[in-house]
């Protein structure tokens, strides 16, 4: 229902307009206060790159964070990552991730980023505290990438990158809750880069698509072509589950059942195992896999995806970030 409201297919969005105007007024006032320096943002001693979005829901932001971190690491840059840690609840904050940190403590996306990149990752509702925790333990960190936080104006940033779903884009264009917008589309004029996940990019936007890798068995780590798996049940607890199901079909998989779950939904063995019958194979997203690995069955697999950016702009962006991190 919410997708139909936000896309404008359902007329119910008009009933929510008063709340949207209030949301827009408050969020706009907050940003204006920082812009006019009525409130002061905290500036880190190292450059900060924000990877965020203008809309609620999944846009492919986390794969972009992983891509950025890996690309900078390949250039010899030491990168730290901070996040709000949505979906997790730590005993205390800030929380610096380790090999033993669970998604229940840190949230699924920070754990995924940590496992993928081996970069220092910290979570906290106050991102400045997360940055301080990283720099205290890892003084060699040269640049911070923040996963989400475009609207977290308490944190000063040097570069802003926005990720857009190229198919859904901005829906009906209205602020939450009548539409999907955290900020209106005009905000794009002030950011440093706009990355478009799928769809047809517009002038000045960087095209991106998610490239699936081999399926990985959660229990054994065995890899295989996902099309070799039979009697597949697909599960996705991400911001936009249909994207994952479409990726599977693109890979030649015709799932017998597709199970969309809420983003950041808590998972347990009983609930997940109930999704498959004898002889069926469960295929999930990598984000779900970090929550299920501890209690996985032998017939559970996940399909990792990597961000692939096209054109000349990604190289220019990386050169800019490398120069920033190097102090040039």
UniProtKB/Swiss-Prot annotation:
InterPro entries (alphabetical): LpxK, P-loop_NTPase
Entry's EC annotation: 2.7.1.130
The UniProt keyword set, sorted, is: ATP-binding, Kinase, Lipid A biosynthesis, Lipid biosynthesis, Lipid metabolism, Nucleotide-binding, Transferase
Q: A Gene Ontology CC term for this entry?
A: plasma membrane
Taxonomically, the superkingdom here is Bacteria
Q: For ATP, which residues are the binding ones? A: 55-62
Which pathway does the UniProt entry assign to this protein?
Glycolipid biosynthesis; lipid IV(A) biosynthesis; lipid IV(A) from (3R)-3-hydroxytetradecanoyl-[acyl-carrier-protein] and UDP-N-acetyl-alpha-D-glucosamine: step 6/6
Q: Which residues cross the membrane?
A: none
Give one GO biological process term. Answer: lipopolysaccharide core region biosynthetic process
Q: Which GO terms describe its molecular function?
A: ATP binding; tetraacyldisaccharide 4'-kinase activity
Q: Which reaction does it catalyse?
A: a lipid A disaccharide + ATP = a lipid IVA + ADP + H(+)
Q: What does this protein do?
A: Transfers the gamma-phosphate of ATP to the 4'-position of a tetraacyldisaccharide 1-phosphate intermediate (termed DS-1-P) to form tetraacyldisaccharide 1,4'-bis-phosphate (lipid IVA).
Q: Which family does it belong to?
A: Belongs to the LpxK family.
- HAMAP family this protein is in? LpxK
**What's the protein name?**
Tetraacyldisaccharide 4'-kinase
Q: State the organism of origin.
A: Escherichia coli (strain SMS-3-5 / SECEC)
- What's the name of its gene? lpxK
